[in-house]
């Protein structure tokens, strides 16, 4: 009975909110905008590399976004078409239909932001949650559900998320089986604490908790009966500080046992740590980054791999190449099951008007990055420890 009362109260509140929003919109002009993208490819056989022409002989990807805005209210959808999808995209994408739709009400004066439908979001550096799209790579793990963002006072922001992730497309959006539930809090201490308002050092703190639910069963390994956990939790704490030309940040993330295809269905807990230190002034910039990862694969479907249904994101600490040759010669991707890595980058601009700077100035950059596997000891094959945990980590070093 109490739940029904709460639900009715929430429904009444939303109805009043929507009514107030409509009244407020009466004085605001409506705006409709959008964009269209089409990618068509024709294929020819290349015997030198063994490329075989697909039966369709062509690939076709297209999308169109339509957005409606009026005051604090916005809504939109994305119509997509894959007939057939171009090579390099998930081959299971097929047909035409709506792949993304949402409605949003955001009132900054009241400190409330409500979204239903699809949305993208990220907590901190993404170590526990990042929903994003990289259309050119065929990556889209948009959340589909409900998001509430509250700003109860200046300097404090709360996020609540509940939904499923985009997984497939067959004449329309298909979500994965797992349910994602998340909460995030971020505090700007210089705004919240009056005594810190004029301090030269600006500090922001944040904390997140993300869990997933996926039905699971038990299975036998040797003499052990192992049950798949249905509820998996992860959490993170972060800090960011800025003082004049200096910036420093750190984030730690943890995850309870999460057997999956990525880790060989072991019950080992996961950890990740990311830290950056940077300095900049006119014409000069320095950035140092360190990252440590141990078993931090986190998906809303434990049986999938590669780019399918990732909840979190572990960034690579190497330079993002501008030119394809360097990226081809030195490819790198984060090893989410375990690695220790670090990078250093220096940027310098030779002043314009100087002999080397020329008319517009000359920009120089140098970078170094290294990644190593963790220092681990694998448990003896066939032992209980090996089945459950796989290995023991001796240190974060190589």
Task: Mark where each language-model region is.
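Bacterial N-terminal signal peptides
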Residues: 9-20
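Short, compositionally biased strand/turn segments
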Residues: 97-99
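Well-ordered mid-protein domain cores that form the structural environment of catalytic cofactors
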Residues: 101-103, 110-127, 131, 135-152
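N-terminal secretory signal peptides that target proteins for export/translocation
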Residues: 1-7
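Short secondary-structure capping/turn segments at boundaries of alpha-helices and beta-strands
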Residues: 62-65, 101-102
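Signature for the C-terminal beta-barrel architecture of outer-membrane proteins
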Residues: 26-59, 68-69, 74-75, 79, ...
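Signal peptide processing junction and immediate N-terminal pro/mature segment
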Residues: 22-24
């Amino acid at each position: 009975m109490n739940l029904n009362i709460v639900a009715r109260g929430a429904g009444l509140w939303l109805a009043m909110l929507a009514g107030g929003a409509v009244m407020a919109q009466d004085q605001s002009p409506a705006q409709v905008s959008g964009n269209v993208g089409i990618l068509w490819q024709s294929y020819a056989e290349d015997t030198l590399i063994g490329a075989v022409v697909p039966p369709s002989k062509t690939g076709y990807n297209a999308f169109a976004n339509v957005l409606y805005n009026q005051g604090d209210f916005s809504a939109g959808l994305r119509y997509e078409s894959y007939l057939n999808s171009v090579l390099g995209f998930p081959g299971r994408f097929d047909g035409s239909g709506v792949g993304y739709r949402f409605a949003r009400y955001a009132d900054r004066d009241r400190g409330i932001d409500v979204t239903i439908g699809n949305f993208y979001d990220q907590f901190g550096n993404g170590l526990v949650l990042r929903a994003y799209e990289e259309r050119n790579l065929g990556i889209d793990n948009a959340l589909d559900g409900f998001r509430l963002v509250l700003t109860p006072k200046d300097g404090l922001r709360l996020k609540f998320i509940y939904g499923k992730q985009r997984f497939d497309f067959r004449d329309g959006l298909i979500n994965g089986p797992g349910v994602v539930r998340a909460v995030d809090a971020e505090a700007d201490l210089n705004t919240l604490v009056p005594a810190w308002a004029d301090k030269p050092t600006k500090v922001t703190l944040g904390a997140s908790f993300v869990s997933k639910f996926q039905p699971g069963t038990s299975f036998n390994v040797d003499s052990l009966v192992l049950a798949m956990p249905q509820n998996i939790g992860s959490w993170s704490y972060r800090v960011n500080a800025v003082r004049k030309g200096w910036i420093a940040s750190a984030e730690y993330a943890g995850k309870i046992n999460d057997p999956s295809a990525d880790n060989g269905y072991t019950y080992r807990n996961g950890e990740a740590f990311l830290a950056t230190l940077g300095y900049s002034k006119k014409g000069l910039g320095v950035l140092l980054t360190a990252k440590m990862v141990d078993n931090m694969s986190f998906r809303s479907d434990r049986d999938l791999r590669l780019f399918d249904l990732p909840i979190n994101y572990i960034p690579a600490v190497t330079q993002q190449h501008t030119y394809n040759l360097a990226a081809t010669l030195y490819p790198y991707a984060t090893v989410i099951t375990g690695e220790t890595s670090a990078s250093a980058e220096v940027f310098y601009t030779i002043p314009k008007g100087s002999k080397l700077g020329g008319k517009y100035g000359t920009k120089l950059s140098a970078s170094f990055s290294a990644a190593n596997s963790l220092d681990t000891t694998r448990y003896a094959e066939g032992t209980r420890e090996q089945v459950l945990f796989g290995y023991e980590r001796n240190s974060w070093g190589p």
